Amino acid sequence: RDCLLSRGLGDVYKRQIRINRFGATTAEEFKKAMKELQKQGMKDMILDLQGNGGGYLNAAIDLANEFLGQKELIVYTEGRTAKRSDFYAKGNGDFRNGRLIILVDEYTASASEIVSGAVQDWDRGIIVGRRSFGKGLVQRPIDLPDGSMIRLTIARYYTPSGRSIQKPYDSTVDYNKDLIERFNHGELM
């Protein structure tokens, strides 16, 4: 199961749904859990993406669609030779009006960052927690003649406002600077 209901928040109007990963059935599981909570009177939601390392792009798009209006950009990809591809919300989601809080941490990555980035850029909810991992690369698998495979990075993911999800590691200096900055802000304790 990719989606879990958390009990014991006290207020029936606020409930938490935790998503462990973005698999093939995540959006379907989320909708089922959300509808159950709405029957119980849920008005506001806490979506816990802490420790979620990502998964399928389509699952992230389907989940973000639950919160966003029609034709709102969820994410786009663009590379040096790969043309820009845009992914939009259909506007038929079931939780477009209630208050939304998304929990993230330093292990929240990839598809999770796509969802939280879209919600943040559209001012649809509040993101709470530590800075997320920063994994935003589009990779294409290439089969080799010996039966092995490599993944070639062809583009990056960008939030609706144009922020690259991928951390910029052009050198180890940037990596170490980011690590020190995160430590100084208490993010790695």
Kindly give the residue locations of the regions a language model identified.
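C-terminal "post-core" interaction segments
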Residues: 10-189
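Positively charged, low-complexity/disordered segments
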Residues: 2-10
